[in-house]
From Swiss-Prot:
GO terms for molecular function: cytochrome-b5 reductase activity, acting on NAD(P)H; FAD binding. It holds the Pfam family NAD_binding_1. Catalyzes the reduction of two molecules of cytochrome b5 using NADH as the electron donor. Gene3D superfamilies: Nucleotide-binding domain of ferredoxin-NADP reductase (FNR) module, Translation factors. Changing residue 298 to S: No effect on NADH-cytochrome b5 reductase activity. GO terms for cellular component: azurophil granule lumen; cytoplasm; cytosol; endoplasmic reticulum; endoplasmic reticulum membrane; extracellular region; hemoglobin complex; lipid droplet. It is linked to Methemoglobinemia CYB5R3-related: A form of methemoglobinemia, a hematologic disease characterized by the presence of excessive amounts of methemoglobin in blood cells, resulting in decreased oxygen carrying capacity of the blood, cyanosis and hypoxia. There are two types of methemoglobinemia CYB5R3-related. In type 1, the defect affects the soluble form of the enzyme, is restricted to red blood cells, and causes well-tolerated methemoglobinemia. Its cofactor is FAD. Its EC number is 1.6.2.2. A lipid is attached at residue 2 (N-myristoyl glycine). This is NADH-cytochrome b5 reductase 3.
Amino acid sequence: MGAQLSTLGHMVLFPVWFLYSLLMKLFQRSTPAITLESPDIKYPLRLIDREIISHDTRRFRFALPSPQHILGLPVGQHIYLSARIDGNLVVRPYTPISSDDDKGFVDLVIKVYFKDTHPKFPAGGKMSQYLESMQIGDTIEFRGPSGLLVYQGKGKFAIRPDKKSNPIIRTVKSVGMIAGGTGITPMLQVIRAIMKDPDDHTVCHLLFANQTEKDILLRPELEELRNKHSARFKLWYTLDRAPEAWDYGQGFVNEEMIRDHLPPPEEEPLVLMCGPPPMIQYACLPNLDHVGHPTERCFVF
């Protein structure tokens, strides 16, 4: 009798164990491994491809630990690259243009500041020139996620006033964005996250400032998104030095541009900014204030 009960117990337990094992394997397959497991750890990633986008802009692709890994970067956050250059530790923040929909790699689009091209900065950019000098197969250290803003979807943003504070949740129907130069990368990250979700009806208004037409980073990607999602993504450029045949704005970001190309204050939008500090301090913030956008609804990456 005891032997029969033992056999019966094994017969009952085996299907349960088998089903549990199968479910665990399916769960593991459906849950990709995360590269950035801790924001306090540096993860060396290997350069596997480099694409020349323009005379001074490159797309760098780095391999994640396995083809099944994702980076693990929430939308709105950035990473830090660190390298020892000329005996000194150099750390710089960057926002990837790839997302956690991409497995096995992370892409960075970076403008290379070459030496002897800008009179105020004759040495050029330390990190960007270091990246330019890297060979395929070389590694560089990534750390993150970092940042005070996370986009949670459906118009919901979690924003921390500082690193120690709890996030404040803001839900909006429209987002104003002002980007200058390489400041476009965090904007593109948020725009893509919104546009890929057909149930996210948040409308994005991007005002993108550059010096010349050839300086416009990621223009094909932006215009493809605009053409595909014209009801939800509004795009306007302004150039310091515009060509004669130019269909967009000219000059620095000003009050008129903000009135014409960002959502009005009455819609209670969130306004995101990223660009050179002088642009933010002297062009964006004062003119946003003149138009009526309150400080608490403005965020600078």
